[in-house]
Amino acid sequence: MITAIFINVGRGPIVDEKGLAKALKKEKIGAAGLDVLEVEPMDPENPLCKLSESDRLLITPHIAWAAVEARTRLLQEVYKNLKAFQKGEKRNVCTG
């Protein structure tokens, strides 16, 4: 059995959910943990629903951000961004 664990807490649409369901059924990967789905709330026709009794699939309701550490970091970054804004400084600049 393959023991790789697939985890997605970023964006739902980047995962081929049909392919993931197939890989889990055929034991091509050991397990999967998802905090995001392509369609939320989860569509009853989603192929992952058929694996709901699997002990190799964990789906959480888009709450990865809710960990104390994540919220603490969020507040720290907001504070730093506000301070930088007051000083006319730029932070977290993304250019394409």
Residue ranges of model-derived segments:
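Helix-to-beta-strand junctions that scaffold the AdoMet/dcAdoMet cofactor pocket
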Residues: 1
